[in-house]
């Protein structure tokens, strides 16, 4: 059995998230239908993570299996013909048979976009905030995330996860180049909990508005209680932008780094 990674992007506006839902469309379902149509059999697709409803991805990774060796360029081309306009496949890449899109991922990176400007053409991809925010104070609070590994306070309640332990390696607010009214929160970790990034952003916004001190943000983490954290920021401004893997999971002929050939310069949307 051969295993393949699919590198794709999607606009999550019209989807109830990545994962198949009983009463709503999902990115996973669309991808499975396209693959099943092309390969003429039922195909299961496993993603690197589960983005929530309305959340986007400029780079998601998923895997599927097939008995025969496939021409990966042809697979990518056929999928792009079958998929709706808001889902695009960058590349299909053969990996080792035991490689896993979710469990072998070593890091994931998300970006969240906040703007003070009213602009109709990016309203689906920015969270508009009112009034000024203290981004220096927000970054000071964000740096405290590196001191902790239990993020129960930022996890969705009543989920089936076995642990709320995550290792955050980057968390920073920066002004978006070319857009003086837009700031971007970039966060990288080995794994993320359900709703975690949006909960962190929502709580950091309270710091930026002066409603919560940096020490108060620290206490929110330490209390390990979701009710103590801020309201989750809307999903429409959140993007999954990268998923990282060890090189040894790739077959010998595909060991070149994929990102340099997939993403636009800067790797942002």
Swiss-Prot record:
One of its GO terms (molecular function) is pseudouridine synthase activity. Keywords: Isomerase, tRNA processing. One of its GO terms (biological process) is tRNA pseudouridine synthesis. Its EC number is 5.4.99.12. Substrate binds at residue 110. It comes from the Bacteria. It catalyses: uridine(38/39/40) in tRNA = pseudouridine(38/39/40) in tRNA. The active site is at residue 52. PANTHER family: PSEUDOURIDYLATE SYNTHASE, TRNA PSEUDOURIDINE SYNTHASE-LIKE 1. Formation of pseudouridine at positions 38, 39 and 40 in the anticodon stem and loop of transfer RNAs. Belongs to the tRNA pseudouridine synthase TruA family. Homodimer. This is tRNA pseudouridine synthase A. It comes from Bacteroides thetaiotaomicron (strain ATCC 29148 / DSM 2079 / JCM 5827 / CCUG 10774 / NCTC 10582 / VPI-5482 / E50).
């Amino acid at each position: 059995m051969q295993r393949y990674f699919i590198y794709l992007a999607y606009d999550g506006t019209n989807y109830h998230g990545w994962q198949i839902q009983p009463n709503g469309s999902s990115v996973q379902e669309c991808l499975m239908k396209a693959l099943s149509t092309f390969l003429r059999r039922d195909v299961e697709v496993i993603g690197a993570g589960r983005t929530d409803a309305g959340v986007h991805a400029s780079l998601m990774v998923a895997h599927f299996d097939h008995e025969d060796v496939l021409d990966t360029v042809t697979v990518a081309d056929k999928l792009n013909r079958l998929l709706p306009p808001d889902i695009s496949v960058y590349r299909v890449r053969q990996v080792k048979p035991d490689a896993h899109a979710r469990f072998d991922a070593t890091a994931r990176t998300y970006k969240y976009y906040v703007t003070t400007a009213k602009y109709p053409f990016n309203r689906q991809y920015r969270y508009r905030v009112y009034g000024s925010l203290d981004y220096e104070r927000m970054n000071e609070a964000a740096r405290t995330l590196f001191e902790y590994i239990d993020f129960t306070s930022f996890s969705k309640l009543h989920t089936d996860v076995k642990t709320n332990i995550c290792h955050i390696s980057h968390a920073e607010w920066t002004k978006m180049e070319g857009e003086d009214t837009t700031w971007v929160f970039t966060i990288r970790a080995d794994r993320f909990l359900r709703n975690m990034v949006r909960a962190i952003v929502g709580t950091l916004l309270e710091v930026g508005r002066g409603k919560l001190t940096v020490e108060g943000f620290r206490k929110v983490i330490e209390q390990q209680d979701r009710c103590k954290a801020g309201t989750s920021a809307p999903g429409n401004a959140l993007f999954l932008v990268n998923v990282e893997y060890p090189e040894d999971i790739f077959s010998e002929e595909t060991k070149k780094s994929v990102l340099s050939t997939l993403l636009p310069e800067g790797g942002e949307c």
